[in-house]
Amino acid sequence: MKKSILVIALLATVFVQKTFAQDSTQQHQLSQLLTQYYNIKDALVAGNGNLASIKAEEFIKTANSIDYKVISEGNINALLKDATPISETKDIKVQREHFSNLSNNMASLAKSVKLTTEPIYQAYCPMKKANWLSNDKAIKNPYYGSAMLTCGKVVETINQ
């Protein structure tokens, strides 16, 4: 009887540790996805189409590594559909057009899945009529870069 209880307790401990490790890996993947999104945004703020393309490729790799149990296949495909054109061109105007859709899909994802424990600021540019996400309250507009760097305002804080 004591051996049975000991075996059950041991199996329960192993199962809990395995589940915790999976949760930790999944949370890391989600955090990486958000970080890669921020990297694309920062490249667009800097007006660097080459860097935005590279960062979009990294975003795609991260998105492709996420288990469909964590984010649905449909959501991942929507993110890939938005990020792929950014990765395939160095033309910053084209990249910024696709970034708007990517931002909308990332905002929806951030509201439904905990991507990070840190606040996520959703900002809005009235000139472009588009949103983006940031890890900083300070406005740095990815749609106009240095031409209108501070155009916009924070409209929502996610994970507050």
Pin down the residues of each PLM region.
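Bacterial Sec-dependent N-terminal signal peptides
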Residues: M1-S24
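Intrinsically disordered, low-complexity terminal tails/loops enriched in metal-binding residues
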Residues: F20-Q160
